[in-house]
Amino acid sequence: MATKFPSFNQGLAQDPTTRRIWYGIATAHDFESHDGMTEEKLYQKLFSTHFGHLAIIALWVAGNLFHIAWQGNFEQFVLDPTHVRPIAHAIWDPHFGSGITEAMTQAGASGPVNIAYSGLYHWWYTIGMRTNEQLFQASIFMSILACWTLFAGWLHLQPKFRPSLAWFKNNESRLNHHLAVLFGFSSIAWTGHLVHVAIPESRGIHVGWDNWLTVLPHPAGLAPFFTLNWGAYAQNPDTLEQVFGTSEGAGTAIFTFLGGLHPQSEALWLTDIAHHHIAIGTVFIIAGHMYRNTFGIGHSLKEITEAHNTRHPLDPHKGSFGINHDGIYETVTNSLHFQLGLALAALGVATSLVAQHMGALPSYAFIARDYTTQSALYTHHQYIAMFLMVGAFAHGAIFFVRDYDPELNKDNVLARVLGTKEALISHLSWVTMILGFHTLGIYVHNDVVVAFGNPEKQILIEPVFAQFVQAAQGKMMYGFNALLSDPTSSASLAANSLPGNHYWMDLINRQDALSAFLPIGPADFLVHHAIALGLHTTALILIKGALDARGTKLIPDKKDLGYAFPCDGPGRGGTCDSSSWDAMYLAMFWALNLIAWVTFYWHWKHLAIWQGNVAQFNESGTYLMGWFRDYLWLNSAQLINGYNPFGVNSLSVWAWMFLFGHLVWATGFMFLISWRGYWQELIETLVWAHQRTPIANLVGWRDKPVALSIVQARLVGLAHFTIGNILTFGAFVIASTSGKFG
């Protein structure tokens, strides 16, 4: 056992037990708790870690580029993207026998390979890459970028280059920089790549380092830009007959507003995507000039927030809502946990939206027909969104424990939220019970009547409000005649008066899985409410954890016990499981439960449509046994049969992962149910045996072995539960989809 310990916490170094290891892991990244930590040092360390994070991302991208260029089949994919299965990398495994070697030698490879379900091939193809050489060049560039960002991280820890605390807390300048430079410039730079490289390549015109200065992206050049004749850039778009990657049917437009999908690539029009990026880049650059700069021009955030109150002489409420946002500016500025919570919540919502839109409005050429990749990407992004959202509430709770100042926030919105927490929490509890009892009640009723041979007695509710929303966006099948589904409405007349061709109505009324809004019925209505139950229950646990973080009637001094504590002292057994950490821990189980329902729904509905059997979802999705039998059991069949006495197949690895995932998941329960005393006794018995066994007793250790604390065991249990859950469902999604569609 190590005798030295990192210098960040001398208290750990004195601990005579194996707790040191666990507390070391727990506090390694809790910079605030480290010895000798000042606020300025804290900000500098965090700023430096951002560059390290960027380096890891750049290295990961470089690795993907390198291995696909080296071992993949990108150039073959470019020639036939709808039929060539993309290769992620080769497999070199000394354990492979002839059966598995043969099974994994696929997609035209000469040896065993893994198939890529990441969508990287489609992305690189869409943005104009065509050769392995280009992938290698990009890989080298990303590797250099990783080195450069690592150097930047190191540099900003050196005395001469450490930013000051005042620099970090200059909110207006930081917002201006992030909005205008990071978001604005990068969006316009991406427009540049799309216009100069991707769009010409999609029209069969090669643009590379050899000719990029001589190939005009538009016949008129910059003349329309300087003469304000911007409409010229939208004229002569690609036709509906255009063959992606060739000049056949190609136009010359670079910024369009066509809507819908390119008929052949079944992805958004590249010229629409370019238009989106230049528009949003322009908006961000304008936004990056809103806040007060070093010349005193622009808005002060403090003035804006403090103007948002009810003390204005013309305000009808006359201060009845307290002082609203006074103190909020200082609270957010001085709390990294508050800022992180806001950032995680925003990013969590954005990631969930990305998951939805990658399926509903695919932006990469031909990816919509790679059903396994689409399923994997949806699942991947929804799971990430879940982790980000739980993290947002976790850091919100840490803010209340560590950073909240009751004096500074007296009678403002934060104090008012804390003051009305009983009403908030009890209402959420009521909502979850209403949703839970009604949804489960209808599902179980339907199960019973189907089991007894009376399926016509099911309670089937049409989602009329959601159907109305779909109709308003132009879906004709429901017969609602609202807004865009009514040809005579003001919305339709305005849409029809737009110059040029527009294809939104074609997209929304498609009969396949690419319709922007899929048809919905009673099965969708029920699972929607099941998902709403999961969302509200997760939110209830997390919001309660944050709002109760400082104290409750049961434990008034909770804030002094910290973010994570097992129980409030001996003899007060009723106080266990009440820390904010415990709320996060419990919410994780509900969040995993919820995200499974979300992805089950998306996956099954799409499988049914892709197979031309949409009735399966519509009819079986209205009762629980239908979900268990026709989705879970039916699609597990390939996994359970992945390898058998007659040999193996290309799904074997997923079958093994499916089984292994269940094992990891089940291991979690050992830590979640068996608690400390049992383990402590077992450890002491094992130590006794070790010390009396020849040869083994030559190895000793300094630390007294101690069982995991309740909080530590919960962390280990939750980690196994989560990782097992993801391994199991990931293998299920990929194998069940690729087993049907390749």
Curated annotation (Swiss-Prot):
PSI electron transfer chain: 5 divinyl chlorophyll a, 1 divinyl chlorophyll a', 2 phylloquinones and 3 4Fe-4S clusters. PSI core antenna: 90 divinyl chlorophyll a, 22 carotenoids, 3 phospholipids and 1 galactolipid. P700 is a divinyl chlorophyll a/divinyl chlorophyll a' dimer, A0 is one or more divinyl chlorophyll a, A1 is one or both phylloquinones and FX is a shared 4Fe-4S iron-sulfur center. [4Fe-4S] cluster binds at C567, C576. This is Photosystem I P700 chlorophyll a apoprotein A2. NCBIfam families: psaB. Phylloquinone binds at W679. One of its GO terms (molecular function) is 4 iron, 4 sulfur cluster binding. Its main location: membrane. Belongs to the PsaA/PsaB family. The keyword NADP does not apply. GO terms for biological process: photosynthesis. Divinyl chlorophyll a B3 binds at M670, Y678. It is found in: Cellular thylakoid membrane. It comes from Prochlorococcus marinus subsp. pastoris (strain CCMP1986 / NIES-2087 / MED4).
